[in-house]
A protein has these predicted regions:
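Alpha-helical transmembrane-bundle signature of multi-pass membrane transport and export proteins
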Residues: 1-169
Length: 169
């Protein structure tokens, strides 16, 4: 427990931990809400959902190496922050399209593709952040604390999505 209290003294670690929890709440909501949302579009079916999810996965695979280079060339922290914020904007656009009854498979595929590209930049940048912000002796505790908190955030997000889908449709 001493290591965790040492971690809390590091401002950059606290910010990263809070950001991961908040972001992962959204990451828990998104796939569930998106699946139900896509299937609610008139004429959409399981194939439509597969197009949307594939549109997100293809750039993730294609651009991961670019993400590694970008993480090395530009600041990892800045890249993580920017990609998280821009990704949230595209998820918000998708959510707004559902709320205003303007959602379409092409729009969701486009947004998914952009989100996948952003994730391809995010993952390599995030994987190298921890050694930059915490001392080596606290690295294991930092990684496990952020991992646990991020998973808790994802679980909370998935639970929120379940409530939203069951009550709001």
């Amino acid at each position: 427990m001493g290591e965790v209290s040492e971690l809390w003294k590091i401002t950059a670690f606290r910010r990263l931990l809070i950001a991961r929890v908040v972001s992962n709440i959204g990451n828990g909501i998104t796939p569930i809400a998106l699946a139900f949302g896509v299937l609610s579009i008139p004429g959409a079916d399981a194939g439509s959902l597969s197009y949307v999810t594939t549109a997100q996965m293809i750039p993730l695979v294609l651009f991961m190496l670019v993400g590694g280079v970008a993480a090395d060339r530009f600041g990892r922290s800045q890249l993580v922050g920017i990609t998280d914020i821009v990704g949230s904007i595209f998820v918000g656009i998708s959510a707004l399209s559902f709320l205003t009854s303007h959602a379409s498979i092409p729009l969701l595929c486009f947004n998914g593709f952009i989100f996948g590209m952003l994730n391809a930049l995010w993952y390599p940048a995030f994987s190298g952040i921890m050694p930059i912000i915490v001392p080596a002796k606290l690295l294991q505790a930092a990684n496990s604390t952020v991992g646990l908190a991020a998973n808790a955030g994802f679980t909370v997000g998935a639970s929120i999505a379940g409530v939203l889908v069951s009550t709001a449709g």
